[in-house]
Amino acid sequence: MDALTRERTLIGSDDTTGLDLEPVQRPSKDEAMAAVRTLLAWAGDNPEREGLIDTPKRVVEAFDEWFAGYHGDPAKELSRTFEDVQGYDDMVMLRGIDVQSHCEHHMAPFLGKAWIAYMPTGKVVGLSKLARLVEIFAKRLQTQETMTMQIADAIEDHLSAAGVAVLIDAEHQCMSTRGVHHHDVSTITTQFRGVFKTDKVLQQRFMDLVKK
């Protein structure tokens, strides 16, 4: 096995809740950097000039951070739960979780906030795990609609929650920096599962807390 083959790894084999992904062979870092140089030249610049000479390396390192969610495992994040909750049986909610993602159509960033609530059935998960769950799905190429469903699916499936509510409010740079060039337009997506879908009073409680 040569060095290039050894450097390649398979990605996409973790929990990909809400996605139909087959494991793919990840190119080497050198191959990824070469692809960035090609795009720089296609844009009309010289990838060998002083200001761009290190850009391919920086872009590849940025991709590692922006798309780290492909290596995250939602099931693992939600696997450790606590049952000693002193009989707590009401809504658990996290408000204003940062969302930093990229759309799958133009790879343009979309930035916003997420609100998550669930109704536990005897066990709860650490609050930081829910924020981490959002980060795992956000750091993948996808649509906001898909991400909203992925988060709801994961909480419903792995926590056996009686109900789940997810709302994401984000601004898409594919709308503001290209195409129609509309600024200050936000997209809101929601998912309600279980009692949050059937109990309109509970659903309204969630929405009121979002607005608070």
From Swiss-Prot:
Binding site for Zn(2+): C103, H106, C174
Pathway membership: Cofactor biosynthesis; 7,8-dihydroneopterin triphosphate biosynthesis; 7,8-dihydroneopterin triphosphate from GTP: step 1/1
Disulfide linkage: none
Reactions accelerated catalytically: GTP + H2O = 7,8-dihydroneopterin 3'-triphosphate + formate + H(+)
Gene Ontology MF term list: GTP binding; GTP cyclohydrolase I activity; zinc ion binding
Keyword Hydrolase on entry: yes
InterPro entries (alphabetical): GTP-CH-I_C/QueF, GTP-CH-I_N, GTP_CycHdrlase_I, GTP_CycHdrlase_I_CS, GTP_CycHdrlase_I_dom
Single Gene Ontology BP annotation: tetrahydrofolate biosynthetic process
Keywords for the protein's UniProt record, in alphabetical order: GTP-binding, Hydrolase, Metal-binding, Nucleotide-binding, One-carbon metabolism, Zinc
HAMAP family with a match to the protein in the record: FolE
Family classification: Belongs to the GTP cyclohydrolase I family.
PANTHER family found in the cross-reference section: GTP CYCLOHYDROLASE 1 (PTHR11109:SF7), GTP CYCLOHYDROLASE I (PTHR11109)
Summary of subunit composition and partner proteins: Toroid-shaped homodecamer, composed of two pentamers of five dimers.
Protein name per its UniProtKB record: GTP cyclohydrolase 1
Organism: Caulobacter vibrioides (strain ATCC 19089 / CIP 103742 / CB 15) (Caulobacter crescentus)
